[in-house]
């Protein structure tokens, strides 16, 4: 996992202006049920679509225990969360973005670029959904 994190951080450094000379984040693997409970708590029913998340309060990346470091999609998921970690440690919230949710507007296109350029995988995502999720006032809709 260490080598994968190093290679992903190097890619992030080459594609962005962020400082990536950072301590590696702690990675915790957990079951799908535990992952969703940790992220959603009791607020939302689990639906099995959460792959991972970054907790900016603890600087921990939580991954599904079925993470496969040889799977391109899984590498893209880890890249996505590492981007949030790098953004957080580069203090982009309040400078480049109004809130942490808004950082998704940068992360999804970079994840798409990484998967296509490095793995030849076309990653499609719903840009409108991401735009809505990136809203700093989630109760607006």
Placement of each model-derived feature along the sequence:
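Mature extracytoplasmic domains of secretory-pathway proteins
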Residues: 69-71, 83-86, 96-97
